[in-house]
Structures are given as C-alpha cells and as structure tokens.
Amino acid sequence: MELALQITLVVTSILVVLLVLLHRAKGGGLSTLFGGGVQSSLSGSTVVEKNLDRLTLFVTGIWLVSIIGVALLTKYR
C-alpha cells in the first residue's frame, strides 16, 4: 500500500509540473519576469484551456490525497 502511494505521489508530482508548464501565462505575477507577459491577439479561455485547468485540478487533488496517505502511513507505521 505504501509503495503504491509513493509511486502515485511521484507520478502525480511530475504530471502537475508538466500541466502547470503547459498553461499560458495570463499576465502579472512572476510570469512577466521571464517574458510571459506578452499577450496574444486571441484573448479569452478556449475549450482546451478549460480542460487543461480541470485536468490540473484533478491531478492536484490526487497528489494531495497521496501526500496525506503517505504522511499517515509514515506516522502510524
């Protein structure tokens, strides 16, 4: 059980990083520091962006549950 949670944690950690990097910069914050503040002529959210947001939230939820699971298993081992 602990091994499965640890594998899930590693996989979801990598997925969260990749999914966050796939998002377009929305301006402001630290993204403008690295040139992410340039806006394209297409403003607004597309279906792809909305689905990417949903997928990111879903994977982040799994990541959070696996972190709590690993912490509880470590504490009560």
Swiss-Prot record:
UniProt keyword rRNA processing, yes or no: no
Location in the cell: Cell membrane
Membrane topology: Multi-pass membrane protein
Keywords: Cell membrane, Membrane, Protein transport, Translocation, Transmembrane, Transmembrane helix, Transport
Membrane-crossing segments per the record: 3-23, 55-75
Keyword field contains Transmembrane helix: yes
Major localization listed first in the record, in broad terms: membrane
Single Gene Ontology BP annotation: protein secretion
Gene Ontology terms: cellular component: plasma membrane
InterPro entries per record: SecG (IPR004692)
Pfam family membership, one: SecG
GO molecular function: protein-transporting ATPase activity
Function field: Involved in protein export. Participates in an early event of protein translocation.
Family note: Belongs to the SecG family.
Protein name, entry field: Probable protein-export membrane protein SecG
Organism: Mycobacterium leprae (strain TN)
